[in-house]
Amino acid sequence: MPGSDTALTVDRTYSYPGRHHRCKSRVERHDMNTLSLPLNIRRGGSDTNLNFDVPDGILDFHKVKLTADSLKQKILKVTEQIKIEQTSRDGNVAEYLKLVNNADKQQAGRIKQVFEKKNQKSAHSIAQLQKKLEQYHRKLREIEQNGASRSSKDISKDHLKDIHRSLKDAHVKSRTAPHCMESSKSGMPGVSLTPPVFVFNKSREFANLIRNKFGSADNIAHLKNSLEEFRPEASARAYGGSATIVNKPKYGSDDECSSGTSGSADSNGNQSFGAGGASTLDSQGKLAVILEELREIKDTQAQLAEDIEALKVQFKREYGFISQTLQEERYRYERLEDQLHDLTDLHQHETANLKQELASIEEKVAYQAYERSRDIQEALESCQTRISKLELHQQEQQALQTDTVNAKVLLGRCINVILAFMTVILVCVSTIAKFVSPMMKSRCHILGTFFAVTLLAIFCKNWDHILCAIERMIIPR
């Protein structure tokens, strides 16, 4: 049957996923992001024709959606540009810090001037991009608010247009039904003027609605006449390619219309509409179910696309934040590493300087001790020479004065005692010199020694007073 063939053709067209994907891509290239569903089906000749009639409200909705999508794309682009500018600014800051750490004062001043110019340029560009971003956000909010206010008005307009279109189709059906019967009886091949089933279903539904509202279905003719006066050229639209529609008297009521449709037949050799209505109704029901499923799939796909875009935006935002944080941590780590290297170098230099100073002090102390020991040795040698001279002199005196043995013996003993005393004195002097020599290294040591001796003298002089004071402090009254 032609009706079933039409339903199967539409079913195959919408059920084949590859073709549906290609059709969707073509529609997206022509700025139509949604699948427009057929609102009226007309048949003529040997081909099946689909009449795609898109309401103005849907087109306005698509325009608003396309404008909002373009604004969202611009917002994403501007956001990426802002992130790029911020990363370049951070890179300039890191490079400036590295160059300043390794540069002189003059070079640091020049580098600072260049960095300030770059920083001002990047700040200006970021400010401009932020202004653009705010403008795009404001436009997007305005478009969303305007689209929400228009949608309630467009819904009522679409309902009125659907009612007018269904009544007009019912009027055309009632005028072309007798002609369909004649063509089926004459058996003209290649021409099929059978209107779609859902036209009759729609006309009956609206007839029932109007009957419930106005009390009778006879007022449909008046509504049809008003619609014909509103758009008279739509009623004279032909269904076949070479067939001519002859205007016939209208049916007076819904019963006549139903009887006319039940008696009509196709020109392709099919039975009457009443006989093949079941298969056509099944095909049309399947088509409606498939179209409803396609709508649900389309809505689900749109929701998934929005969720994916939201996830992409969130992922990009989080990725930019994490990358910026990692970059800041890397720059901080590099700065800390440079500071650590500088501190280690400074400590190494300080330890080297301390080692050099300790070595020089040790050399000085060793040299001074050597000089002092040599001086003491020379003094002892001089004393020994003097003692030897005195002994020689004593021997000479003993040889000369043999008479005065006792006197010489006494004199020798005295001299020995004196020499021993002198030796003790020299040893004491050398020992005192060894203890005093560290106190006489510098002026500070000399002053400290002088003050210590002075305090000791004062302490010895006032020893009685000190003892009295101690007794007063210890013994209570």
From Swiss-Prot:
Cellular localization per UniProt: Endoplasmic reticulum membrane
Keyword Chloroplast part of the UniProt annotation: no
InterPro entries assigned to the protein according to its UniProt record, in alphabetical order: TEX28/TMCC
Domain of life assignment: Eukaryota
Polar residues bias locations: 258-273
Record keywords: Coiled coil, Endoplasmic reticulum, Membrane, Phosphoprotein, Transmembrane, Transmembrane helix
Membrane topology annotation: Multi-pass membrane protein
GO cellular component: endomembrane system; endoplasmic reticulum; endoplasmic reticulum membrane
Any Pfam family: Tmemb_cc2
Modified residues annotated as Phosphoserine in this record: S46, S253
Tissue: Widely expressed, with highest levels in brain, spinal cord and testis.
One Gene Ontology molecular-function label: identical protein binding
Coiled coil: 112-153, 282-398
Predominant place of localization: endoplasmic reticulum
Keyword hit for Cell membrane: no
Transmembrane parts of this sequence: 417-437, 450-470
Stretches for region Disordered: 168-188, 249-277
Family to which this protein belongs: Belongs to the TEX28 family.
Subunit structure: May form homodimers and heterodimers with TMCC2 or TMCC3 via the coiled-coil domains. Interacts with ribosomal proteins RPL4 and RPS6.
Name of this protein: Transmembrane and coiled-coil domain protein 3
